[in-house]
């Protein structure tokens, strides 16, 4: 591992941090250390990192801005690549937008709305990066990334880089081909938006933000929606009907504000959250006969 660290530093891939606690990089404020954390400063840095990871036969994981993520208390083995600083380029040409995978999604939706571009209003309250949003087909307010993405530039495990079209991304509810068949890193996304009325777009975005503020507990560390909605039901409704609102294990609590959110009240461990998730699954299965599946990504040792 020491030799790998030395080569990563010599290759100038970006910031190289050893045994770096990941709690500070997740919106849940939970997570043990990464053996090696890389914050690449350019695409070449990511490519070189993957070359060295392959050379040393080391496991690797990619995170964005740490939303929709629960990291194990034991941390993550191998190399963790955090997208951000080196992938925040943006190019807007009429209604076509090309943007780096590390660009903050809320910042992008706000900026484009002010330019009178419609289509990203749903993302006005979704924390995280463009890359993470494309990876999991993030959505809200009856829309999602699949409605606006035309193609995405992906760096695959074998080091090749290629564009995947909308069809090749194989989008479904909170899922893409990158989670199922072709693991890779979203370097860039191209969105097709519509030219609209600026005042109306900004108004819709503000309503979405207000709704989130009034119904979701973003004043506490959390990872967003914990469970996928089991059609035709809503996960939050089932959890609340089961009487679990406010239930707490350790420092993790099912939000009083929204049943599908687990908040860190202070000092929560990943195990606290996992115990709550298991309790919810079993309770909903017993009471309603409905199987619950997590939307939050659980990673680590």
Swiss-Prot record:
Its EC number(s): 1.3.1.98
Ranges that cross the membrane: none
FAD-binding PCMH-type domain ranges (all copies): 29-196
GO cellular component: cytosol
Any Gene Ontology biological process: peptidoglycan biosynthetic process
UniProt keyword Cell wall biogenesis/degradation present: yes
Catalytic activity reported: UDP-N-acetyl-alpha-D-muramate + NADP(+) = UDP-N-acetyl-3-O-(1-carboxyvinyl)-alpha-D-glucosamine + NADPH + H(+)
Cell compartment(s), UniProt: Cytoplasm
Domain of life of the organism encoding this protein: Bacteria
Pathway linked to the protein: Cell wall biogenesis; peptidoglycan biosynthesis
Matching InterPro entries: FAD-bd_PCMH, FAD-bd_PCMH-like_sf, FAD-bd_PCMH_sub1, FAD-bd_PCMH_sub2, MurB, MurB_C, MurB_C_sf, Oxid_FAD_bind_N
Main location, first listed in the record: cytoplasm
Alphabetic keyword roster: Cell cycle, Cell division, Cell shape, Cell wall biogenesis/degradation, Cytoplasm, FAD, Flavoprotein, NADP, Oxidoreductase, Peptidoglycan synthesis
Active site: 174, 225 (proton donor), 295
Cofactor: FAD
GO molecular-function term, one example from the UniProt record: FAD binding
Known function: Cell wall formation.
Family: Belongs to the MurB family.
Protein name: UDP-N-acetylenolpyruvoylglucosamine reductase 1
Native source organism of the sequence: Bacillus cereus (strain ZK / E33L)
Gene: murB1
